[in-house]
Amino acid sequence: DAQEIVDMAKAAGKKLVIGYILRVHPAWMEFIRRAQGLGKPLVMRMNLNQQSSGDPWIWHRNLMQSLTPIVDCGVHYVDVMCQMTGAKPVKVHGMGAKLTDATKVQNYGHLHVEFDDGSVGWNEAGWGPMMSETAFFVKDVVGPKGSVSIVVPQDGETHTSSDDIDSHTKTNALLCHSSEIDENNQFVHEDEWINMADEPDHQARCDREQEYLLKAINEDIDLTEHMQNGVDSLRIVIAAQESIDTGEIVRLD
């Protein structure tokens, strides 16, 4: 269905913007830009587990009437992976578990995806009152030239709740590491910290999506790669769910 919509937009000469909020988030755009400079292949590790209770658990149960977390949540981070690699996904393996009787589907899942440039990605998503908040927000990319990570508050600092919607895209800081070493096998560069404390809130990011659509129309921006990444990310998470359901690795044509 997504591919059909993209094809229709191309045929009609219309602008189609994929509604993934991370695409217009300044800090995430910088995260992607830094990852693209790490060389190939890339190793991409991203998760978002949400320990939900009260209203958030009601929202999650409602969502799981039609989608699993690895599809609903995972598609955003897999889309980031597609932008980082610029490569074609070729193989997906998914695994999941049903940790509650309150839903008919698995409320936990993770996937592994391979790209045709040798890059690999891992994504994990789980929802519910049983989920751990240990390492619930991992956003980490490694390449031959180093690594870049999104760093969130650690123990002893300001606590970030896993079911806080605003925290799902919040970066706090980027940690950039260079792998360059000298003749004594010592690192040449110190790690670089990029503070992202002034990033826009959730509503401001939604506003940026609308602004980008208007810009795409007014400036006739070529959205070919933008749309293809959106289709590829959806293909990956749907393939992951198929893999979970069948127990088989899914190869993408």
Model segments located where?
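Rossmann-fold NAD(P)-binding glycine/threonine-rich loop
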Residues: 1-15
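C-terminal glycine/acidic-rich active-site capping loop/insertion
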Residues: 21, 115, 138-228
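Hydrophobic residues in well-ordered beta-strands that form the structural core
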Residues: 16-18, 123, 150
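Predominantly a Rossmann-like dinucleotide-binding segment in NAD(P)-dependent oxidoreductases
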Residues: 14-17, 22-104, 109-111, 247
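Glycine-rich, aromatic-lined ligand/substrate-binding cores of catalytic
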Residues: 87, 99-101, 109-110, 115-120, ...
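Terminal low-complexity tails and localization/encapsulation signals of metabolic enzymes
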Residues: 213, 248-253
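Aromatic/hydrophobic pocket-lining residues that form π-stacking "cages" and hydrophobic walls in ligand
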Residues: 5, 31, 239
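Glycine-rich phosphate/pyrophosphate-binding beta-alpha loops
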Residues: 124-132
